Amino acid sequence: DIGKALSELRDENVPNVIDVYSGTREFDCIEPLKKAPGINFCGEISAESVLEVMANSMAVIHTESFEQEMMELVRFSVSTKIAESLMYGPCLIAYGPEGIASIDYLKENNAAYVISRPEDLEKGLEEILTNKELREQIVRNARALALKNHNADVNPRKVRKWLQEVVDKSQNENSTN
């Protein structure tokens, strides 16, 4: 959907192709990407190269399926790649239905440009890709969210504190019984 929408945009300042990177070797996954309009399938890159590719990109795209069966499977999950994108990436564009944890999380925190309806895709892509100030604001929000919720130094302390509170509460309840 995204590649097709991009390929139909007629703004010379907007890229009309998406570079897709994946290490998958599954023919059923790769072949449709290679044939899709607006998609340049680049294959696999090293983990070290990911940050460099992200740094040289206008945006990073996170997608979730609109198919009901897939929506049920991912309803409560948030990809670890999202945290990476928030911390190191350019503007994150999220495309998927509301009611999916990752889409809702990004939207509630203004940490991505969220397009949650297929009928809004082309217009939304044009808006975010032509508005540098909006992309920069989203990146600022994303960095702040990453520091708050996805920080390797802070999160273990948060978990320990939470576990200690649970233990303390349990001990207090047991001592009063």
Per-range role (PLM):
Residues 1-8:
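A conserved mid-protein helix/loop that constitutes part of the nucleotide-sugar donor-binding site
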